Design a protein with these regions (language model features):
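N-terminal signal peptide c-region/cleavage motif recognized by signal peptidases
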Residues: 12-16
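Cleavable N-terminal signal peptides
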Residues: 6-7, 17
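Positively charged n-region of N-terminal signal peptides that target proteins for export
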Residues: 1-4
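N-terminal, motif-rich segments that launch catalysis or mediate targeting to/interaction with membranes
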Residues: 18-149, 156-287
């Protein structure tokens, strides 16, 4: 059995990156949970307690914890990555992102009818809102998906171009980091703050929580969030896009060289995106649970 879970984790971690990394998801969901009312926190905890044992093991193995370790909301939000290579969940793989044609200028609601990240948020918010008093596996899954999707939609490369798989084919010619392409770099390596990165991110974002209050949840907001990420990913400093005179994005070389100050320059962008993701998740859960 231990070998079975090890293989699942290896497969999930060795494939191309299509999801914000563990650290980002944990930070978003822990911050959101901490800013819920005590009543809403209790409702989240009740749903987490209903996670089947098999899926608790999957979450813990994915996070390099002992199989029977307690599950909190931070670790539970990594569940959609822990299970996405399982046959029964393969249908959800495209839901982690939204890739558009290279000539796209902005994101609109009719750009995606199903099987993409904005629609995934709407779908699982609706499922979670149904039969609020019930504790069942369908609602538990919706909670875990929803927490995960809020992290993904705020990572700019999750709303990007189809012809290079959202930056997964844009590789580096010089970096020795474990993140071998631009999408992967923004999923994980851009969040690096040395030892205890998670604690540092939580402290930083907690201190800034009240500086940018967010409006109450409305369904049309998901397209605004996608548009925010899309415009960020098209900005010249990210080294992913060269705008032409028609404001569409020209493809960059398959291998690029990032400036030496790239991490310092752009980590502040992910700081803003993680904060917004957590605040907006808090608003959704407050309305939905």
């Amino acid at each position: 059995m231990k070998l079975f879970f090890f293989i699942l984790v290896f497969i999930a971690s060795s494939s191309p990156s299509f999801a914000l990394g563990k650290l980002g998801h944990q930070v978003v969901c822990q911050l959101a949970f901490e800013h819920l009312s005590l009543t809403k926190q209790a409702q989240v905890s009740t749903l987490l307690n209903a996670i089947p044992q098999r899926h608790k093991h999957l979450i813990n193995n994915y996070n390099y914890k002992k199989p029977n370790s307690p599950i909190n909301f931070a670790s539970a939000c990594t569940w959609p990555d822990a299970i996405k290579r399982l046959e029964e969940y393969k249908t959800y793989q495209p839901w982690h992102y939204m890739n558009v044609p290279r000539d796209h200028i902005y994101i609109r609601a009719n750009d995606c009818r199903k099987n993409c990240l904005p629609q995934a948020i709407l779908k699982h918010q609706q499922v979670l809102a149904q039969t609020k008093s019930e504790v069942n596996w369908q609602r538990v899954q919706a909670l875990l998906f929803l927490g995960h999707w809020l992290g993904d939609i705020h990572q700019p490369f999750h709303i990007s171009f189809a012809d290079d798989f959202g930056g997964n084919r844009v590789k580096f010619s010089h970096l020795t980091t474990k993140c071998k392409n631009l999408h992967w770099y923004w999923d994980e390596c851009i969040l690096y703050k040395g030892r205890n990165s998670k604690a540092k991110w939580l402290a930083l974002l907690t201190a800034k929580w009240h500086l940018h209050p967010q409006p109450n949840w409305q369904t049309e907001q998901v397209w605004q969030w996608a548009e925010e990420s899309f415009q960020l990913v098209k900005s010249a400093s990210l080294s992913y896009c060269q705008l032409n005179n028609q404001y569409s994005c020209q493809k960059v070389a398959d291998k690029i060289r990032l400036p030496e100050n790239y991490l310092q320059q752009h980590q502040v962008i992910m700081e803003q995106r993680l904060l917004l993701a957590a605040q907006r998740l808090t608003k959704i859960l407050t309305t939905t649970l």
